[in-house]
Design a protein with these regions (language model features):
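Catalytic phosphate/metal-binding cores of nucleic-acid and nucleotide-processing enzymes, i.e., regions
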Residues: 156-159, 176
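Nucleotide-sugar donor-binding catalytic core of glycosyltransferases
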Residues: 1-146, 195
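Short, hydrophobic/aromatic alpha-helical segments in well-folded domains
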Residues: 7, 121, 162, 179-180
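Hydrophobic, well-ordered secondary-structure elements that form the walls
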Residues: 125, 150, 180
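Alpha-helix C-terminal capping segments
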Residues: 58-65, 153, 184, 199-201
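A charged, aromatic-enriched C-terminal amphipathic alpha-helix characteristic of glycosyltransferases
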Residues: 168-200
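Conserved acidic donor-binding segment of nucleotide-sugar-dependent glycosyltransferases
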Residues: 150-156, 165-170
Length: 201
């Protein structure tokens, strides 16, 4: 399984003899640090990249902080929020990589089904040299230890506080970003395939 480790426990209850927890990963040819001629500093801003849905709209409206949003479908928002700067449309791999590399924070909004597990952005953001800010849960903390490879939050109050903390301490944020970019290499889909084959053959 890849969606959540909890599925493995359910499979065991169903007496499935062999099951393997294989989390998502990243494509090393697509999700990579951009090849920039000049070294750039982060822009002291926050981004979220992803397709529009009502849950994400409500999340960002409730958070109510300045954030740049990229992805298809965001022109569907009926009520405009002055703090949400929208660039609606598809994002190619090169632009996606530049966004994650340039911004001080890349926010990962976990959907309801992911709240206690992980999603693709858990790996893709650090692979592109982004600084991952994601919801706190055991599964993600096992993959990327909090305050070592990423930042985590529990609720809106802590999320706002954590954003201020990250922007105020760029030195620590830079260390965490670099450590995560190195750590994530073991989670490429190439390595996932090697692991799977070693357990099946």
């Amino acid at each position: 399984t890849s969606f959540s480790k909890m599925l493995n426990f359910k499979l065991k209850k169903l007496k499935v003899k062999k099951n393997i927890f294989l989390p998502f990963g990243y494509d090393k040819y697509l999700h990579r640090k951009p090849n920039l001629k000049k070294k750039t500093n982060t822009n002291n801003k926050i981004n979220f990249v992803g397709a529009y849905d009502k849950y994400r709209e409500n999340f960002l409206n409730k958070l109510n902080i300045k954030i740049d949003v990229f992805g298809p479908g965001w022109n569907k928002m009926k009520k405009k929020n002055k703090n949400i700067n929208i660039s609606s449309g598809m994002i190619d791999g090169i632009k996606l990589s530049k966004i994650n590399n340039e911004y001080s924070i890349s926010l990962n909004i976990m959907r309801k089904q992911d709240l206690n597990s992980h999603n693709m952005k858990t790996f893709e953001i650090p692979a592109m040299n982004g600084l991952l800010l994601t919801r706190r849960n055991t599964e993600q903390n096992t993959l990327f230890k909090e305050n070592v490879f990423c930042y985590m939050y529990k609720d809106y109050k802590e999320l706002r506080k954590k954003i201020k903390h990250i922007l105020a301490d760029s030195t620590k944020a830079k260390i965490i970003r670099k450590a995560a970019h190195k750590k994530v290499r073991q989670f490429s889909y190439d390595n996932r395939l090697k692991f799977l084959l070693s357990n099946l053959l």
